[in-house]
Amino acid sequence: MVKFSAAIEALRKESEHLYNNTYAIVAHAIGFSRKDIQSDKSFKEILENKKWFSKNVDLDYLYQTRIKVLFEAIIDFSTKAQVYVNDETKNHKIFNFKMAAKNLAETTKNLKIIQANIKKYSSSSNEFLALEYNKIRSNQGELLRSIEELRVEDREKLYLIIKNLQKGKEILKEIDTLTLSNVEHLISVRKITTAEEISILNDTTFATKIAEELISAVEVIFSKDISN
């Protein structure tokens, strides 16, 4: 029988692998490279000097080859490990890794819903429409950058960054509210159409879900140093 500590480390390792794949998929689907995310340039500067990749990111293929296999392996291993664990606290810790894997899988699915609009409208000749979609890209990029910073920080700062990510969930709700207010203004001054307003609001909602799923997964996967 596998020891609990060994099972948790195995789950963490595979979950990190799943996160790394998700991270790369999200970054490329919103038009950024790993270098962009890890740089110290502002996303405003990056967006001003960067062109979209000519080819679309095939999210169906990437989900099947980079996400689904790992997701199913984590769920299978977790379920088998839980059979041998009677302690409720330990069982819950294993369950958390299941949920983290589920959140990362859902991230890719939700990304598929907004990918086409993000690429289309962030390059729109309508500067007001483009700005709203580039805000979505910037917000996602900032989140990925924050998570990358989390992974290289020492124990003391790690706790603070985790707390900031948790606060980020509340900030996401504020962004939704601000977006609604802003697009209503754009409609009132006829800078965007009603159809474009609906697209912005729907895509912002899905972008928020993606961010929440990433944060929830990261809280589990990268909290090793503050949970032991």
PLM features: residue spans?
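Cytosolic, long alpha-helical scaffolding segments
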Residues: M1-N228
